[in-house]
């Protein structure tokens, strides 16, 4: 008897279609409630109705013909899940119906040893995740659970039933990955704890093996024993899977998710001695794929990161469509097909599904569509792809080791023989027992050999892993040593850079200090010059003011003397009028003189008014002088504040430089002391901090320079104000000179008038005799006029007294103003002395800062020497590490030699086992031939016995 060949089955991809109910968005849209899809579940036919009207005028022109012609699509199964019955009146399909039709056969194929695959394809929001997972993705249990949890539940029920028979046990492992933006991420991979959002992604690589096929390198597979374990792992994966809300779907999958179930059978056999032999049996892989839905950007209205995700999703689905077209074309046309190789490697999704499409797998596809007219084009496109996928033919084979398959066949033969032995002829039963014993011994021997080979293979795999680990450790040590050397070089280079930068900063600081001191010296000199010039101008103005006041007083005294002379002359006239009689001509002349005296008195009143105006002008000049002094004080205060800010900035810069120096020293020591990546990160962070401190110092220096410029602008503004004040003062002086000239002109005119009056008085004395006749007539009138003149003179006297009092008040104000100015001058001198003392203290502080800087430089040099000593220690440690590495390499070489010797021994043992197996096979063939001959002889004897028995019976 020869071993049977591997069991292979060729069949098409099973394609099903599920039509979901209308959702809320479609019910609220004007055309959303219009159903364009009809289905016959019994006949597995889907009909896309004619879409009439012009409401969809914005659709693509390429769909125009499809809109005007109804199309029928034939599939393997159709699930009508709309609330109303289908075209034949059948009730809507439930989740349980989908599982009975699709999920149950998948479980049967898995336990038969066939690879299988189920993937959901369709537009976004068409119900793929609901069909695969269920109504609530976070709770995969209950009546609404999808195909995936139902398949897992059936697997565990079948597993318990098989293991109850006691011949084998099944091991189930689960993996969960997603394809996001053309990168494969392990959703069950170990992530860092305590990181928001699950931590970083755990990416795996897609590889292809000649015998294993496509697999994921580095994927984490977790053994599961119940549905609760599966639900827990899937919920963990869903927690880190990429989903988002779009216009089409509140929870849209932004990646393709694949749940991988691996089933491995472990068969057991008990020998006559009671030893239990365990061998590998069948194995299978089941891929449950939840594809991300295709979406139109105009409908889903995604942007930013979601737009990028939609681009990758549509690209991978387009590649899947191309693969389906190529495989379908190859299956239908054979050698005449346009392409001979499908573009699996154009996308990670199609590369993973390579065995499921046209390979070693029994594949089921479920296409989900929407019945609404809003999704007419997407529904029609999905149905076309699904119909095209039905043409793909897969050739699936049972995944079982040939030796294990032979053992299983022997066990099946032994079971058949045990059943044949029940109630049979004793001789035949005895013969069968002998054959059964031979078969059992052969099966046990094969099982033992297979177990030994498996153990040997496992041992070799362990040795290979150890060898690879040793090589990896060596390369890791070498790379670590190189990285350490590079790190030390970079650290030393960084320390040199930091030292050079520190020197540059110190030089820059010294230069800035010198420039600021020069600028301050210039500003002080300019302010001193301006102060001296203003003091000289104020002194000259004070002298001019005093001379003007003295001149005005002198003029006032002269006017008082002239007024006294006029009064004396008036008294003389009155006496002349009283003592003699005047003529009418004298009277007229006297009246004329009296009129002239009155006009002269008016002129004197005008002179008094002018004097009062001059007094007010003097007061205004004094007020402007006070304002000028106040502005000068403000300028001095601003200069003092600017100087104080400068000193504070210098102190702040020195503090920052000291801190930067301390940071750099600490960083240099830490960089030389530590050799791992964390220290390098701290060095970068500290360097960044130092750089920020330097930038802050530069910004502070810039702000100080800006303040200095503002102070200069303020000083210039004050200088312009002082110039304007000087111009106003010059204008006032000019007005005063003009007034003085006018008063002098009026005084000369008064003197000329007095001379004229004197001449007139002489003429009057000459004419007195002729006027005595009219004196008596005019005496009464003159007496009345005299009384008026006396009253007017009294008024003039009172006005003169008030003018004298005003003059005294002006003198007092002048004295007080002079005292105030002298006090301000003394305060300015005291302030200048204070500024000089502050400048001396600043110079002393600068000398102290220079001494501190020198001490800091000495400390830095000492720390640099210590750092160099530390570098020497590190170099010695590196040499010891190199020596240890050489020792480890020698140990590794000896280990490698030992492993190679063990490997050669294993190969020799394998050769011996192979020769023994060949001898066993030859002996087995001879035994089988003898057994066949014996069987033929026994059968001949049995026939002879039966004939003999028949003859005896007939007799």
From Swiss-Prot:
UniProt KW keywords: ATP-binding, Coiled coil, Cytoplasm, Cytoskeleton, Microtubule, Motor protein, Nucleotide-binding, Repeat
Record localization: Cytoplasm, Cytoskeleton
One cellular component (GO) term of this entry: cytoplasm
Keyword Iron set for record: no
Pfam family for this entry, one: Kinesin
Gene3D superfamilies: Kinesin motor domain
Boundaries of every Kinesin motor domain copy: 12-392
Sample GO molecular function, one term: microtubule binding
SMART domains: KISc
Protein name: Kinesin-like protein K39
A biological process from GO: spindle elongation
Biased amino acid composition, Basic and acidic residues: 785-794, 824-833, 863-872, 902-911, 941-955
């Amino acid at each position: 008897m020869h071993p049977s060949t591997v069991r292979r089955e060729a069949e098409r991809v099973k394609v099903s279609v599920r039509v979901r109910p209308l959702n809320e968005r479609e019910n609220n849209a004007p055309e959303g409630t219009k159903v364009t899809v009809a289905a016959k579940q019994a006949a597995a036919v889907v009909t896309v109705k004619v879409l009439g009207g012009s409401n969809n005028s914005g659709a693509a022109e390429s769909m125009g013909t499809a809109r005007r012609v109804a199309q029928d699509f034939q599939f393997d199964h159709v699930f009508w899940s709309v609330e109303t019955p289908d075209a034949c009146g059948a009730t809507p399909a439930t989740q349980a119906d989908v599982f009975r039709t699709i999920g149950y056969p998948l479980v049967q194929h898995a336990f038969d040893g066939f690879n299988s695959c189920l993937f959901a394809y369709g537009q976004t929001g068409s119900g793929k995740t609901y069909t695969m997972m269920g109504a609530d993705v976070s709770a995969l249990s209950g009546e609404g659970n999808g195909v995936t949890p139902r398949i897992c539940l059936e697997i565990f029920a079948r597993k318990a039933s098989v293991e109850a028979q006691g011949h084998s046990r099944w091991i189930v492992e689960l993996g969960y990955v997603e394809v996001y933006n053309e990168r494969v991420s392990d959703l069950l991979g170990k992530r860092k704890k305590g990181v928001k959002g699950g931590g970083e992604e755990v990416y795996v690589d897609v590889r292809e093996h000649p015998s294993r096929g496509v697999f994921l390198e580095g994927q984490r597979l977790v053994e599961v024993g119940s549905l609760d374990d599966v639900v827990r792992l899937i919920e963990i994966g869903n927690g880190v899977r990429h989903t988002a809300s779009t216009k089409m779907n509140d929870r849209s999958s932004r990646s393709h998710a694949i749940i991988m179930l691996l089933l491995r059978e472990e068969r057991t056999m008990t020998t006559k001695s009671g030893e239990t032999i365990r061998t590998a049996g069948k194995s299978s892989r089941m891929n449950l794929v939840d594809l991300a839905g295709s979406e139109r950007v105009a409908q889903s209205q995604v942007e930013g990161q979601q737009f990028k995700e939609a681009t990758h999703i549509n690209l991978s689905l387009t590649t899947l469509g191309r693969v389906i077209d190529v495989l379908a074309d190859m299956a239908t046309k054979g050698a005449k097909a346009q392409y001979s190789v499908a573009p699996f490697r154009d996308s990670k999704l199609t590369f993973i599904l390579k065995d499921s499409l046209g390979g070693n797998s029994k594949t089921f596809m479920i296409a989900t569509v929407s019945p609404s007219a809003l999704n007419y084009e997407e529904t029609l496109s999905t149905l076309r792809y699904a119909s095209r996928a039905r043409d793909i033919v897969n050739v699936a084979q049972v995944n079982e080791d040939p030796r294990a398959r032979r053992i299983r066949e022997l066990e099946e033969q032994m079971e058949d023989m045990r059943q044949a032995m029940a109630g049979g002829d004793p001789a035949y039963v005895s013969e069968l027992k002998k054959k059964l014993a031979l078969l059992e011994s052969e099966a046990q021997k094969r099982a033992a050999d297979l177990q030994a080979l498996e153990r040997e293979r496992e041992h070799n795999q362990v040795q290979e892993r150890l060898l690879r680990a040793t090589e990896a450790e060596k390369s890791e040590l070498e790379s670590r040593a190189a990285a350490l050397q590079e790190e030390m070089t970079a650290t030393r280079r960084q320390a040199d850079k930091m030292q050079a930068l520190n020197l540059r900063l110190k030089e820059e600081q010294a230069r800035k200090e010198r420039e600021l001191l020069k600028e301050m010296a210039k500003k002080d000199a300019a302010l001193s010059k301006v102060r001296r010039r203003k003091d000289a101008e104020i002194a000259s103005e004070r002298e001019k003011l005093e001379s003007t006041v003295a001149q005005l007083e002198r003029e006032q005294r002269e006017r008082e003397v002239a007024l006294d002379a006029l009064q004396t002359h008036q008294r003389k006239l009155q006496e002349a009028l009283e003592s003699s009689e005047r003529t009418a001509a004298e009277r007229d002349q006297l009246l004329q003189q009296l009129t002239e005296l009155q006009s002269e008195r008016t002129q004197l009143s005008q002179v008094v008014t002018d004097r009062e105006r001059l007094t007010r002008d003097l007061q205004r000049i004094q007020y402007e002088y006070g304002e000028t002094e106040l502005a000068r004080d403000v300028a001095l205060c601003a200069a003092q504040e600017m100087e104080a800010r400068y000193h504070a900035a210098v102190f702040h810069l020195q503090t920052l430089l000291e801190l930067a120096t301390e940071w750099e020293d600490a960083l240099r020591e830490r960089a030389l002391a530590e050799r791992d990546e964390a220290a390098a990160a701290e060095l970068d962070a500290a360097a960044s901090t130092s750089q920020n401190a330097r930038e802050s110092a530069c910004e502070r220096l810039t702000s100080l320079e800006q303040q200095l410029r503002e102070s200069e602008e303020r000083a210039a503004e004050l200088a312009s104000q002082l110039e304007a004040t000087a111009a106003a003062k010059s204008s006032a002086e000019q007005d005063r000179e003009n007034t003085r000239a006018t008063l002098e002109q009026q005084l000369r005119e008064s003197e000329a008038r007095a001379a004229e009056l004197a001449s007139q008085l002489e003429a009057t004395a000459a004419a007195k005799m002729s006027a005595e006749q009219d004196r008596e007539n005019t005496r009464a009138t003159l007496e009345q006029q005299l009384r008026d003149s006396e009253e007017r003179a009294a008024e003039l006297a009172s006005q003169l007294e008030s003018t004298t009092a005003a003059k005294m008040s002006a003198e007092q104000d002048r004295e007080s103003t002079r005292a105030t100015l002298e006090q301000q001058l003394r305060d300015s001198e005291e302030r200048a002395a204070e500024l000089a003392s502050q400048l001396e203290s600043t110079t002393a502080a600068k000398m102290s800062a220079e001494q501190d800087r020198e001490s800091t430089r000495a400390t830095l040099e000492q720390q640099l020497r210590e750092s160099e000593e530390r570098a020497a220690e590190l170099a010695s440690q590196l040499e010891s590490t190199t020596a240890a590495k050489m020792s480890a390499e020698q140990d590794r070489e000896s280990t490698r030699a030992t492993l190679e010797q063990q490997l050669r021994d294993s190969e020799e043992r394998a050769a011996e086992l192979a020769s023994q197996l060949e001898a066993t096979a030859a002996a087995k063939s001879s035994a089988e031939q003898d057994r066949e001959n014996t069987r033929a002889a026994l059968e001949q004897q049995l026939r002879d016995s039966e004939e003999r028995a028949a003859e005896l019976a007939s007799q």
